[in-house]
Amino acid sequence: WKFKNFIIKKLLLILCFVPLVSFGQEIKGKKLFSIKAAVGEWQSSVGEYLNLKTIYAPYAKGVFDGIAKGKVLPIGGDYPLYYQENGKTFSDLDIDMVLLTEDNEKIYCKASGVFNYVTETFESLKFQTHWRFRTSSEKYKFLNDVMGIGFGFVLPADSEYNFQHDIYDVHLK
């Protein structure tokens, strides 16, 4: 009987850990873009929706590099919904952006995400985004199938840009 208990315990232990070993999935990714953007004259109170405030922050200029280099066209911007609580701002981002590559190809970018920060200092607490791309360019048409993951950064006050987005194509191995 002791031997059977021992075998049953070993089998249960193996059954518990086999899924972790055999079905564990790994992800891989590559960096697509680093985008630096400057916000132009923004409107502080466009309206409210479900007790959330909204603003419009247009992009005035920007640059990017990675799989291509170029500039951010002064089209689109960010239309976040946000609320403030206990000295912090919690934002739900809604970004529209058009990139123009050095080889004159346009890439439309749409992103959503979160940007939470200390209201008084603009210190970033969380800045993550999800990106989709659209282009008619033959060279970059693979981007139409990419769902990018972005990590954002607030740039120093003396920079000519306000924000940086590092965007990765992440998928299962």
Q: PLM features: residue spans?
A:
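Sec-dependent N-terminal signal peptides
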Residues: 11-20
